[in-house]
Amino acid sequence: MTGTIDLAGDPNIGVYARVFEDIAIVYPGAPAEFTAALARELDVEIVSTFIQGSSIIGSLVSGNSQGLVVSGLATDEELAVLSEYRDVFLLKGPMNAAGNIILANDCVAAVHPEMQIDVAEEIGSFLEVPVVRLTLGGIKTVGMAGFATNKGILVHPRANDTEIANLERIVDLPIGLGSVNMGSGLVGTGLLANSKGYVAGSVTTGFELGRIEEVFGFLE
């Protein structure tokens, strides 16, 4: 259910993969020990593809059980792989790093505060969730300043009461402050989780792990 891991020595595991309840999207050639840990700890099928030819899957993909929101620069070959598992929404225009700018689960999608309203509404309709434009800890790239599963939402330790209230008005889940990798507030860069388990970056401290377990309901 739990553990810490790196990816070829890099603890920023959330940059290179995106996890859902049933699948984990990881770039081809990712270390076997990394993909095996995701499959084992999170009980997911591994889906292997690049996005726009890049390995930074976590930065370029968001979504939930309803669908995937993907950079509009993804290739037809990459989209063919993804479409075997979900419907796919292409995020076009200059603000297209979906994983960086969308924090989503099956209850809500929080998006970059400067995202065009019509685009945000399209994403909400596609994912079948309400949408809120906000910052977390003053950071606009909410997909990396927070991490959401269907059991809780972990947010940047400097997130203020107003930012948290904006989420609480929409979603009835535990929302807590936390960090990863020895103090990084960009929790999405160092965490992969679903309702069944989690893995955190290899330098995440015991205190940080305890906070992750509390917010996501893994304390026994």
UniProtKB/Swiss-Prot annotation:
One GO process term, biological-process aspect: cytosolic ribosome assembly
GO function terms (MF aspect): ribosome binding; translation initiation factor activity
Domain of life: Archaea
Keyword Protein biosynthesis appears in the UniProt entry: yes
Keywords: Initiation factor, Protein biosynthesis
SUPFAM superfamilies on file: Pentein
Family statement: Belongs to the eIF-6 family.
HAMAP family registered for this protein in UniProt: eIF_6
Function: Binds to the 50S ribosomal subunit and prevents its association with the 30S ribosomal subunit to form the 70S initiation complex.
Record protein name field: Translation initiation factor 6
Annotated organism of origin: Methanoculleus marisnigri (strain ATCC 35101 / DSM 1498 / JR1)
